[in-house]
Amino acid sequence: CEGIRTIAAQGFAMSDVVSVGITYQMHGLVCLDKQGRPLRPSIIWCDSRAVEIGAEALEGIGREFCLAHTLNSPGNFTASKLAWVRRNEPGVFAQIYKFMLPGDYIAYRLSGRMSTSVSGLSEQILWDFEEERRADFVAGWYGIPQEMIPEAGVSIGTEARTDEAAERLLGIPAGTPISYRAGDQPNNAFSLNVMEAGEVAATGGTSGVVYGVTDKRQADPQSRVNTFVHVNHTASNPRYGILLCINGTGIMNSWIRRNVTQETLDYAEMNRQAASVPAGSEGLSVVPFGNGAERMLCNRCPRAGIIGLDLNRHTTAHILRATQEGIAYSFRYGIDIMRGLGVRPDVIRAGAANLFLSPLFRQTLSTLTGARIELFNTDGALGAARGAALGAGYYKTRGEAFAALRRLEVVEPAEADRETLEEGYRAWVREVEKRME
């Protein structure tokens, strides 16, 4: 609400809004009563409380059956979080009328209609990829009544319209189509026009993500990466997103800024100082895993750490570089898993935002993975806006929607640094494995 009011205060007329697009952090749980009131604070994506519940469900439902139908372990995802509420907060669970994702809740507040999307069901581990329908067997295992699950529609297309309450609150005309809805990572891929099999998107915010589109139903037997329904999926033209999520990436960089630099440096200056140190950070290494259980490490949490600090050699600049290298190492670790499943990220597209604003990070990631990195003039907000316009018919084709998308920069691997970074990566892997023993 505050953001929309800020836009209106800058002279933009809300009457000019022709459609609404919504993007949100994936996997969060919102529980509503019959009056549409939240019953408890949302349990967000990186909250690890449901890990054991998800592991129990995988074995109880049957590992082979579960992976064949949902392509994922129930893990720490939304359905498992709701099962945690049922087990630990029965009074709250008894009052739930509908549960939904954070983006679904925003759509509800704007429209008065409780709904979700097929892509949303898949990120909750409530979609049966084999049967192309809701995975009621997961809900049944958890004791979740089917009537608690909202009706599901498409991601790109009008599934709801704003109501009079939203018009009174925000000024957006009642009846405006809500014509796009996607979790932050499918939306990031959409914002980069990553829609076809073989295309790969990445982002480096609080968490780091690599998202590869495929037309094949694929599951990682260890659930280190996950498969979800992409925004342009249909039964006749299947599109799935294989998602690598690393919880501890940008949040590590921001922690260093707060606690090491005491916020005396902005990110641009941090990047400049980091670049003054040679590749490999002269033996200093950073493990960034301190933001909850890591899926790519089989839901283990080795914690964050600064390794090999030499008080006579290393400076703040070394810590800054080692942090970005450690984050890039974590991307490399996950991308190797994706390659084992047939995803070949020879080209990685990213928006000019977050960690990808750092020339050092871009170059290090390219060198470690051997991939060409392409930087574009887009972000998640532009993606949701384009999706809304496409879904409402303002744009008639995808080509029209992305006509203004421009490639800003291409980064190729730096062969001169490859051997040093490979040596640093191998030492980093040994440290991570030691922490998981």
Where are these regions (language model features)?
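Short linear loop/turn motifs
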Residues: P150-T158, M270-Q273
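Active-site phosphate-binding/coordination module
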Residues: A8-L82
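Active-site core segments that coordinate phosphate-bearing ligands/cofactors
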Residues: M14, V51, L58-R113, G120, ...
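Short beta-strand to alpha-helix junction loop
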Residues: D128-E131, S155-E159
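Residues that line or immediately flank small-molecule/substrate-binding pockets and catalytic motifs
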Residues: Y24, C46, I156, N232, ...
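Short, glycine/charge-rich flexible loops or terminal/linker lids adjacent to PRPP-binding catalytic cores
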Residues: D47, A160-A165
